Amino acid sequence: MIILAGLGLYDEKDTTLKTVEFAKKADKIYAEFYTAILTGTTIEKIEETLGKEITILDREKVELETEKLINESKDKDIMFLTAGDPMVATTHIDIAIEAKKKGIEVIILNAPSIYSAIGITGLQLYKFGKTTSIVFPEPNYFPETPYDVIKENSKMGYHTLCLLDIQAHNTRFMTANEGLEVLLKIEEKRNENILNKDTKVVVVARAGSLKPKMVYGKIGDLLEYDFGAPLHCIIFTGNLHFMEEDALKYLCENISE
């Protein structure tokens, strides 16, 4: 049996009782933290909560050893952990599919993810369009996909959730400030007037913690704002319902007129 379990968003206290229960019965526990990471805890605290040692796999090992992991679950109970919800990343969906193809039982233990946590802004979840990711630019690599997604969602009046790059192996997490700078550079290149320094966005920091920060304001005002520790994400708002306008006013910190 293979158990795909989510650890939630922030710390070991997000772990569900069901996940703890299955962990105690598991023969072996693996985890990956390259698609998302819990910034409010440590591996040691998670192990203490689960009562088992965890083997951490990097991106290469997960992608290259998926078959090995699945074969191991033919006669053992193998748990595979990730931050957030286990079925958000395509890698985990692939594991579930391949296991099912081989007749292996698959148990999925859902958990809070950024897709549910952005509700703390008061924006209505059904009004979000396609999600996009902003990555650190590199030499000969500067994807403009986020710009295109914001553009298309905006045409339909949808909100856009922008996830920010995580390089856990380098302990490097893109800040909202860096993400906004990337988007402004793409705008400067494309010049399609999709966004500018007067565009209002929402920044969410440390969603899932007891003290998340939600800030609503113009990009120009947010560029130098200190949002604190990661993880951050950015939301471009679409057409706002009056209740959403009230939510942004009262639930978020407003820094622009």
Curated annotation (Swiss-Prot):
CDD domains: DHP5_DphB. Its EC number is 2.1.1.98. Keywords: Methyltransferase, S-adenosyl-L-methionine, Transferase. Pathway: Protein modification; peptidyl-diphthamide biosynthesis. GO terms for molecular function: diphthine synthase activity. Gene3D superfamilies: Cobalt-precorrin-4 Transmethylase, Domain 1 (3.40.1010.10), Methyltransferase, Cobalt-precorrin-4 Transmethylase, Domain 2 (3.30.950.10). It is an enzyme of class 2 (transferase). Pfam families: TP_methylase. GO terms for biological process: methylation; protein histidyl modification to diphthamide. Belongs to the diphthine synthase family. PANTHER family: DIPHTHINE METHYL ESTER SYNTHASE, DIPHTHINE SYNTHASE. Homodimer. S-adenosyl-L-methionine-dependent methyltransferase that catalyzes the trimethylation of the amino group of the modified target histidine residue in translation elongation factor 2 (EF-2), to form an intermediate called diphthine. The three successive methylation reactions represent the second step of diphthamide biosynthesis. This is Diphthine synthase. It comes from Methanococcus aeolicus (strain ATCC BAA-1280 / DSM 17508 / OCM 812 / Nankai-3).
